[in-house]
Amino acid sequence: MSPQTETKASVGFKAGVKEYKLTYYTPEYETKDTDILAAFRVTPQPGVPPEEAGAAVAAESSTGTWTTVWTDGLTSLDRYKGRCYHIEPVPGEESQFIAYVAYPLDLFEEGSVTNMFTSIVGNVFGFKALAALRLEDLRIPPAYTKTFQGPPHGIQVERDKLNKYGRPLLGCTIKPKLGLSAKNYGRAVYECLRGGLDFTKDDENVNSQPFMRWRDRFLFCAEAIYKSQAETGEIKGHYLNATAGTCEEMIKRAVFARELGVPIVMHDYLTGGFTANTSLAHYCRDNGLLLHIHRAMHAVIDRQKNHGMHFRVLAKALRLSGGDHIHAGTVVGKLEGDRESTLGFVDLLRDDYVEKDRSRGIFFTQDWVSLPGVLPVASGGIHVWHMPALTEIFGDDSVLQFGGGTLGHPWGNAPGAVANRVALEACVQARNEGRDLAVEGNEIIREACKWSPELAAACEVWKEIRFNFPTIDTIDKLDPSVDKVA
């Protein structure tokens, strides 16, 4: 008899409530290559043992419920249940533990981030026995990864489409984000692109409002792209935000972008949802469009250290669902982002194989089995003085996006774009000559100012700007004696 139809009627059914740990805490379990592995930060309520808390997470996110049910005997619980297989205390934190849970692959629908998250980060996060719960990391097994298309094109294909190599790409978010007419918006796009940027961008909340309907914006931005390409001889793009109230409307906007011949569209993947995002990613691959992803709403989910979900999990989910770019913080700008943690999930976005490294917040070795990579986008409160640090931190395979750092230039948009392009080219040249950007960065920018008045003006405006606030979501100081999980 197959495990799916095997029953346990002979055992008999005994109604009542029993501790989760009797069924779902299995420290002797050896994980399988096909298991989805999760690392949860668990804060039990007073009086709840960590083993019971970890087992409750495994149960409530897989096959369990609060009481024994007779229908357990109609299936093979051992085949389908989640298992809490290891628990370790969090150093320096009182009553916090990392609970490792293994999920059998058969619990999840193929190619569906929506289904995976509905189980793993579903109702269990409201469980009363837990004071707080956070999903720190997931190990996606190759067997499950292979059921996803992933990014529409990936890093190498994007570079080939743009014919741009050996440096980060430059972008700019058009400001003010709301209120411009479509024609004025297109004018701002044109000035930035002709000044030397590779991309400009719709802000995440630019959809189709009364002051600027989406079709008008698409037309004026396409005009700006073609005019700037003709003047500069470079391929240009603008992230046309296709996010809409329905999936049908979203695809309609993407179809119009394709008909205009532009290279890239955009989606807000968390507010739009993973089902919509995956649908759009499939359309983009089939029709030659790059897909830029904004992470609006992520901080609602990932900002607090003891509850929610770390962004590295959202980044992995996006790579599965599909996107060629995703915003990833800056480390040096106005938005939250610990350096080591950021570099950890940047590698998870770009690389094919990433080793476990708890010093960077990576709990599991991740093999992407040739799934295309995603370009991290550094955006938020950055300007020309940050260029050396950004080039050193993110490397060539990234997009550096300056909104106010372009449009806030005292001479206008095009000079602002020139300043950023000159600063980037100076940093790349200095790096290629063997100079240390972390040490000599400011000097490299000052030298470039001598032959670029646009850069000199930008440096003068932003010389005093700092965002020196402590990072909330930092990596735990690990005690090597407790980290025994591969």
Curated annotation (Swiss-Prot):
Protein name (Swiss-Prot/TrEMBL): Ribulose bisphosphate carboxylase large chain
Subunit structure: Heterohexadecamer of 8 large chains and 8 small chains; disulfide-linked. The disulfide link is formed within the large subunit homodimers.
The record's free-text note on cofactor binding: Binds 1 Mg(2+) ion per subunit.
Source organism of the structure: Aethionema grandiflorum (Persian stone-cress)
GO biological-process terms attached to the record: photorespiration; reductive pentose-phosphate cycle
Biological role stated in the UniProt entry: RuBisCO catalyzes two reactions: the carboxylation of D-ribulose 1,5-bisphosphate, the primary event in carbon dioxide fixation, as well as the oxidative fragmentation of the pentose substrate in the photorespiration process. Both reactions occur simultaneously and in competition at the same active site.
Propeptide: 1-2
Family label: Belongs to the RuBisCO large chain family. Type I subfamily.
Active-site positions on this chain: 175, 294
